Amino acid sequence: MTKIIIEVEVRPSEDENKVLQAIRNLFDFENLKEEKSGYTKILVAESHTLLSLQKFHRKLREERILDAARKYLTKNLIGNVITFMLNKQAAAVGKISFVDDEKESPLGPIKVTIEYKDPQALIDWLTPKTAKGVPLWENPIPSDE
């Protein structure tokens, strides 16, 4: 089973549409819900297909950050779940910037959780090993089944 959850806080000073666009710049999703937490809203985008990661896949190549991203995803793999955080401001302009701590993204990070039956196959598709920055292979997108 494939499950992708993207969570992002919308602070009172932020435009919700711009925060939503930051998610859309890197990911597609099937469902979007809004949760309230005090004065803030949390947008939760969900998907059940790896096709939702195609923009992210393409951006990793455009930005030539495959090696760094591979290390980051592998480091954040526990069992069948990969979790990572992205800088919200970078995503707002269509860029990928991984963060290790929520404080690295002043308005809060975009939190991504991917549950997949074969996470190593997913990592190999998203971020293949490279030689001098060139992918050694390009695997097809893994099956959602």
From Swiss-Prot:
This is UPF0201 protein STK_09490. The lineage of its organism: Archaea, Thermoproteota, Thermoprotei, Sulfolobales, Sulfolobaceae. SUPFAM superfamilies: RL5-like (SSF55282). Belongs to the UPF0201 family. It comes from the Archaea. InterPro entries: PAB1135-like, Ribosomal_uL5_dom_sf. Signal peptide: none annotated. Gene3D superfamilies: 3.30.1440.10.
